Amino acid sequence: RMVLNPDVTVRSRGVVEKCSFCVQRIQEKKIKAKVEGRILGDGEIQPACVQSCPANALVFGDMNNPESKISKYMKNERNYHLLEELHTLPSVGYLTKVRNKKA
């Protein structure tokens, strides 16, 4: 038996929610850093998916900071974006599987 959550809007069939990257967590950390008079550290903000991933397969950070972990991943030659040919300019990147070139 399904139980309805009154805090969640029921969507029409075929409609999915877009990930907000836990904007509430981002804002909370930004405000805290501003109050403390400092800049955010690399990896200080973690959406729920990143925090709960047991394999550390997800990375979140500031792509405008060339020294950040995410920036380095995005420059990796294995990085690609879905539907890149349509120039959608997504902020999510994927690393291809490492393949043995000599095989």
Where are these regions (language model features)?
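Non-ligating segments of multi-cofactor redox enzymes
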Residues: R1-A103
